[in-house]
Amino acid sequence: MRNGVRGIGGLEAERLQACIPLAVDCSRTRLYGCGCSGVSGLLRRMVLSASRGRAIALGNHIFLPDRHDGDLAILAHELTHCGQYQAWGPVRYFARGALEQLRHLFYRKLGLGSNPYHYHAKAGRPFTSYGMEQQAQMVEDSFRSRQQGQVIPSA
């Protein structure tokens, strides 16, 4: 760990990767959480301010607000975005991400369209056919409900 920035590895990575139906190279990810200092801390504060205090993944960099420290379901959601970034590349990832956030803004502020995080899981429908935020929300929900035996569709 350097200046509060750390990688995701060991048992944590195994547990998270087990619930994400996308390939994610955790060794390429960096987590900016509680305890970030120096330039990393400044970067974390700026990103979290711009995201209105919401957890966010920018490429392979995950920024978590203090209230989500230790919340593996939120981390699984954001790690899903890292997997999307790794699979799609930066142009497609950031273009789709910007579009999803605009859709969410229109839905939240104006009541237009549908919530890009909301999904209806259908048997036989592949995981990759869902939207960017739907995929991440499915992983988060699945992680939270694993004790009840619910699973998400395979890739």
Predicted region positions:
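Short, solvent-exposed loop/turn segments at secondary-structure junctions
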Residues: 34-38, 62, 69-70, 80, ...
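Metalloprotease/metallohydrolase-associated module, dominated by Zn2+-dependent proteases
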Residues: 5-34, 38-45, 50-53, 93-155
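Short pre-active-site segment immediately N-terminal to the catalytic Zn-binding motif
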Residues: 47-76, 86, 124-128
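A short, surface-exposed helix-loop junction/capping segment
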Residues: 1-2
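Catalytic Zn2+-binding segment of zinc metalloproteases
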Residues: 67, 79-98
